[in-house]
């Protein structure tokens, strides 16, 4: 009986795979299936529009988007013909209206979005801006969930929930050293931030080495100390 059930399962899967391929053969492009939806590109009279099919290849969301991302967390970023990006659910309803210049798929309930002249921020599934679109660069989070961010040419540090750890006031913020101290630079002077993000050694020095055996060499007032 187990062998028969296994055989029937395999036959069903093969049949479904063939049906999907047959039904989606008419599309110029077919994306990966995620959340039982796959993005498809339909070209009509030279104009391409994206929509979504279900796992069997049947059209689930009409093809009227200028661009479309894969579904994740039950939502997908799509671009309307006018140019703005928003997020739809699996039946094609806008959950977050088109308002962004760029939008990425959701991950763990949040997504990166771009607005206001190529500035990045982060939005949750309810459309709330967890991190406002103020940053030209946002780094990958470290093991603490801290991210280096660039705003108006100055670096700072945020937590993933948007809380400011270090204000955007420095020309450079480096990686923590073995002591957990974070090197930073401001107006050509160097110093260190503590593990909590507060200044422990202000930017007074024209040169400062990394710490070794608890000490660091500095140049202060033209002298090495």
Set out the residue ranges of the language-model regions:
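Sec-dependent N-terminal signal peptides
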Residues: 7-8
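C-terminal motif of bacterial Sec signal peptides marking the signal peptidase cleavage site
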Residues: 14-15
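Residue-level detector of conserved, function-critical positions
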Residues: 18-225
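Positively charged n-region of N-terminal signal peptides that target proteins for export
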Residues: 1-4
């Amino acid at each position: 009986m187990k062998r028969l059930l296994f055989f029937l399962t395999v036959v069903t899967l093969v049949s479904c795979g063939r049906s999907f391929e047959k039904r989606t053969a008419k599309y110029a492009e077919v994306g990966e299936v995620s959340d039982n939806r796959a993005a498809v590109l339909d070209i009509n009279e030279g104009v391409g529009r994206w929509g979504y099919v279900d796992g069997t290849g049947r059209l689930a969301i009409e093809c009227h988007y200028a661009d479309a991302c894969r579904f994740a967390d039950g939502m997908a970023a799509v671009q309307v013909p006018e140019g703005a990006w928003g997020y739809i659910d699996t039946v094609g309803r806008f959950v977050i209206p088109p308002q962004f210049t760029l939008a990425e798929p959701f991950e763990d309930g949040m997504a990166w979005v771009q607005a206001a002249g190529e500035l990045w921020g982060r939005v949750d599934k309810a459309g709330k801006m967890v991190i406002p679109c103020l940053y030209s660069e946002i780094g990958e989070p470290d093991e603490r969930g801290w991210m280096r961010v660039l705003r108006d040419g100055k670096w700072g540090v945020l937590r993933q929930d948007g809380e400011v750890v270090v204000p955007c006031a420095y020309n450079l913020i480096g990686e923590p050293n073995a002591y957990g101290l974070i090197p930073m630079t401001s107006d050509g002077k160097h110093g260190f931030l503590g593990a909590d993000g507060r200044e422990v050694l202000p930017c007074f020095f024209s040169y400062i080495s990394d710490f070794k055996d608890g000490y660091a060499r500095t140049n202060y007032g033209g002298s090495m100390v």
